[in-house]
């Protein structure tokens, strides 16, 4: 996996990441992990940015909405899921096509 320019500052913004994870827990999303939040930020929020300052990173982290993150997480889970390739998935597909 290619390193993102923001990875240099990950340790500096870690308190902001933990703060956002705590906010998600208060909203009932206990299973969000730091790495998945970081992946969302580097893959979506900062995808095309090559130069970032720490205050921009902190602001972007604190402005993440749970809906935006969950949309990203859902799409990523579909991308990595091989359910249709499984026997159970094939049976369900055949049942739908009858």
Curated annotation (Swiss-Prot):
Localisation: Cytoplasm
Q: Name one GO cellular component term.
A: cytoplasm
Q: Name the source's superkingdom.
A: Bacteria
Q: Which residues form a coiled coil?
A: none
The knockout outcome noted for this protein's gene is: Disruption results in severely reduced transformation frequency, but has no detectable effect on either the frequency or the location of division septa.
The yes or no answer to whether the keyword Transferase is present is: no
* Main subcellular location: cytoplasm
Q: Which GO terms describe its biological process?
A: establishment of competence for transformation
Q: Which UniProt keywords apply?
A: Competence, Cytoplasm
The entry's function note states: Required for post-transcription initiation control of the comE operon. Promotes the accumulation of its target comE mRNA to septal and polar sites.
What quaternary arrangement does the UniProt entry report? Interacts directly with DivIVA.
| Record's protein name | Post-transcriptional regulator ComN
Tell me the organism: Bacillus subtilis (strain 168)
Q: What is the lineage of its organism?
A: Bacteria, Bacillati, Bacillota, Bacilli, Bacillales
Quote the gene name from the UniProt entry. comN
């Amino acid at each position: 996996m290619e390193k993102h320019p923001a990875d240099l500052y990950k340790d500096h913004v870690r308190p902001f990441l933990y703060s956002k994870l705590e906010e998600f827990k208060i909203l009932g999303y206990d299973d969000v992990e730091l790495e998945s939040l970081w992946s969302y930020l580097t893959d979506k929020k900062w995808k095309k940015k090559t130069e970032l300052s720490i205050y921009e990173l902190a602001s972007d982290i604190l402005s993440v909405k749970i809906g935006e993150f969950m949309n990203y997480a859902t799409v990523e889970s579909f991308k990595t899921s091989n359910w249709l390739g499984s026997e159970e998935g094939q049976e369900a597909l055949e049942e739908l096509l009858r």
